[in-house]
Amino acid sequence: MAQTGWTSFSQVTTKSNKQRGDKSILFLTVFLAAFGVVAIYSASNYVAKTQYGDEWYFVKKQLLGFGLGLVAMWFCSRLNYQKLKGNRIRYIALILPMILLGLVFVPGIGKSNYGATRWIGVGGFTLQPSELAKYGFVIFASAYMAEDMGRLRTFKGVLPVLLAGGGICLLIIIEPNMSVTMCVGLLMLAMLFAGGMKIKHFLIIFIPAMLAVPVMIIAEPYRLSRLSAFIDPWESPRGEGYQLIQSLYALGNGGWFGTGLFRSRQKYRFLPFAESDFILSIIGEELGFVGILCLFAISGALVWRGIKTAKQAEDFFSFLMATGITLVYGIQTIINALVVSGSIPPTGLPLPLISSGNTSLIITMASMGVLYAISAKREGEGFFSFRTKRKRQFIQ
């Protein structure tokens, strides 16, 4: 009986690989997550002390997520990820997060905060389903597109991926959460493009999607006020413009080399969400422009290892999975940086691996474990190099 159980377990995990994986993926992930713990302490210790009576309040929660994330990353690094493309698993990966997104609106289960209902709470446990939905979509889209490389040559073949991504976006936008909606929308378009969708089909989707953005902004008064505050935050310095002004103050105060670690001024209740969505502002204040550049260099190195893993992937499914995982991390990092610097209107999107939030941390670390597992199966020049020697399908 025990032997049968071990056989079942070994079907979804692998004890070793002939070719060792790219350990820099694991190292960079752990480094960024560990740096995040330090940054969270610096950004939150004053608020945690005054509000909860414990300056380590947010750090303790993040350390728990860090520990669980390490376990999840270890497990996923040994995962036989090819099992994820099975019909049953791909649909579970898509449908389960959508069910959880629906439960967000059930009274007594969904948790609201700052006018948005984005979390599920059971007892003392809180889960943000939109974080699961991003990777669930990656699994479904990768498995679907990998079944037939020519599937996306017709618009009919594109529709299942479009409907899956659109359904997730719809559930997320009514929370409301426009930032994650944008993230999933960009992820969907990028994966379809990587999968070989024709340019004309890409434009058929892209143009209406871009036209829908201003409609979504106008449809909600709070989004319109945020847009106005983005254009000129000093018109409402104590209202919608306050967050952006304080973020810019933090970055400006940091200068080239920063005020020094743990010496932020803006964390003293001047900058809201300093430990979460706007933690990059505190990092910029304490470590300066040079510190932010170093952080982006490390994040960029992780993205580059993901791109390299995708290029050397053993098959189309592996290529798409690595591409999707890298896109989620890269898109979210870029959007967060643009928001903090005032380059786009403020949205609630955490900086992956660094911002406070266990759901995002654990799932991101788990995804990097899958990326490592894919890198361990790379073969020579990889599937991408072979594919690029052929005439690209989307330009025909």
Where are these predicted regions, by residue range?
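Membrane-interface helix-loop-helix junctions at transmembrane boundaries of multi-pass membrane enzymes
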Residues: 151-158, 201, 307-327, 383
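Hydrophobic, glycine- and aromatic-enriched re-entrant/interface helices and adjoining loop segments
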Residues: 110-119, 123, 201-294, 313-321
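Membrane-helix boundary/helix-loop-helix interface segments in multi-pass membrane proteins
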Residues: 2-27, 31-32, 38-175, 337-356, ...
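Transmembrane alpha-helix boundary/anchor motif
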Residues: 71, 79, 140, 218-222, ...
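Loop-to-helix entry and N-terminal half of a specific, functionally important transmembrane alpha helix
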Residues: 309-348, 354
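Interfacial segments of multi-pass membrane proteins
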Residues: 145, 187-201, 265-287, 291, ...
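Hydrophobic alpha-helical segments of polytopic membrane proteins
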Residues: 89-98, 155-173, 178-218
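Hydrophobic alpha-helical transmembrane segments
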Residues: 64-72, 286-303
